[in-house]
């Protein structure tokens, strides 16, 4: 049986809840992609052009990550989970992918969003990291069944 890492970034807690459900359903190890400086509610105000998230996304600023995956060689598959920001992945995800060599790993992407499609996000990842093997992309809300999570990761 292959070993699966479920890595996630969650600023508001929504993606974390879904990642926990996915990890339980597929018997994966959970890993939080944690920014050195936590996000506040004001940081996440996408309507404010001066908010931290707006500045990071508009100026491609990649926040520092406090923790590291201990040994990626232990995993055959990596699930990468995050909320959609500005129709793409948050810049902390780019930082995570730059800092962790996932060459040869199958990377399964899922996102959380109230309404945005995963299409432009998935394309952004493929464009920014052409050497990685992105298997599939899925948008989850947290209302899915355990079977939905299991069948997605085949």
Place the predicted regions along the sequence by residue.
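Acidic catalytic loop of the alpha/beta-hydrolase fold
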Residues: 86-87, 115
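Short, conserved loop/helix-junction motifs that constitute active-site signature segments
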Residues: 72, 98-105, 129
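Secondary-structure boundary/capping positions in well-ordered alpha/beta enzyme cores
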Residues: 29, 103, 132-133
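Glycine-rich, N-terminal phosphate-binding loop of Rossmann-like dinucleotide-binding domains
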Residues: 82-83
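P-loop/Walker A phosphate-binding loop and immediately adjacent motor/lid segment at beta-alpha junctions
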Residues: 50, 105-106
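Short, glycine-/small-residue-rich phosphate/pyrophosphate-handling segment
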Residues: 108-145
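N-terminal beta1-alpha1-beta2 submodule of the flavodoxin-like/Rossmannoid cofactor-binding fold
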Residues: 1-77, 87-89, 94, 98, ...
């Amino acid at each position: 049986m292959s070993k699966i890492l479920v890595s996630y970034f969650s600023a508001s807690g929504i993606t974390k809840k879904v990642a926990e459900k996915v990890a339980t359903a597929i018997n994966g190890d959970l890993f939080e992609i944690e920014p050195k400086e936590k996000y506040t509610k004001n940081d996440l105000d996408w309507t404010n052009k001066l908010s931290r998230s707006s500045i990071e996304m508009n100026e491609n600023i990649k926040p520092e990550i406090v923790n590291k995956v201990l040994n990626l060689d232990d995993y055959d598959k990596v699930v990468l989970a995050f909320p959609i920001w500005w129709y793409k992945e948050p810049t902390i995800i780019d930082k995570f992918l730059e800092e962790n060599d996932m060459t040869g790993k199958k990377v399964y992407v899922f996102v959380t969003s109230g309404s945005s499609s995963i299409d432009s996000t998935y394309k952004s990842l493929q464009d920014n990291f052409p050497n990685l093997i992105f298997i599939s992309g899925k948008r989850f809300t947290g209302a899915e069944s355990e079977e939905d999570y299991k069948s997605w990761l085949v």
